[in-house]
């Protein structure tokens, strides 16, 4: 049995969604435009991938991931998995040394100065 070679392109589902997002057509991208995009950017034989592309598009429309408008398809933004924001690492709080309590000046009752006799 021959070993299966790893594909040089991403999975069809990923590539089609990337194509639709990359084309940025307001009303959606046609199947022809999607195939042209895949051929140009992923260097694949679109004639061979045609059935896989059609199957994915039908499945994605049924699941609500893509929205079909006549012959065009656009990505349903609400159905896309949201990218998780990288969890922010809590910053190590600098341990503040408590300031030494300011010494309160105490007004001591001082003994009145006595005049020295200079005799």
Swiss-Prot record:
GO-annotated molecular function: double-stranded DNA binding; nucleosomal DNA binding
GO BP term (any one): nucleosome assembly
Disulfide bond annotation, renumbered to this chain: none
SMART domains for the chain: H15 (SM00526)
SUPFAM superfamilies, per the entry: Winged helix' DNA-binding domain
Biased composition range(s): Basic residues: 80-119
Gene Ontology CC, one term: nucleus
Database matches in Gene3D superfamilies: Winged helix-like DNA-binding domain superfamily/Winged helix DNA-binding domain (1.10.10.10)
H15 domain sequence ranges: 8-77
Compartments reported by the entry: Nucleus; Chromosome
Keyword Nucleus belongs to the record: yes
Residue span of region Disordered: 76-119
Pfam families: Linker_histone
InterPro entries xref list: Histone_H1/H5_H15 (IPR005818), WH-like_DNA-bd_sf (IPR036388), WH_DNA-bd_sf (IPR036390)
Keywords per UniProt: Chromosome, DNA-binding, Nucleus
Function (record text): Histones H1 are necessary for the condensation of nucleosome chains into higher-order structures.
PANTHER family with a match to the protein in the record: H15 DOMAIN-CONTAINING PROTEIN-RELATED (PTHR11467:SF20), HISTONE H1 (PTHR11467)
Family membership noted in the UniProt record: Belongs to the histone H1/H5 family.
Identification of the protein by name: Histone H1B, sperm
């Amino acid at each position: 049995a021959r070993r299966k070679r790893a594909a040089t392109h991403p999975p069809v589902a990923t590539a089609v969604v990337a194509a639709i997002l990359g084309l940025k057509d307001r009303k959606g991208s046609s199947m022809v435009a999607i195939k042209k995009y895949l051929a140009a950017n992923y260097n694949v034989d679109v004639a061979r991938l045609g059935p896989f592309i059609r199957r994915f598009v039908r499945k994605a429309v049924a699941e609500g991931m893509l929205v079909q408008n006549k012959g065009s398809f656009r990505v349903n933004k609400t159905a896309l998995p949201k990218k998780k924001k990288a969890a922010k690492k809590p910053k190590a709080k600098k341990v503040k040394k408590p300031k030494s309590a300011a010494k309160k000046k105490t007004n001591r009752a001082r003994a009145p100065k006595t005049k020295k006799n200079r005799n």
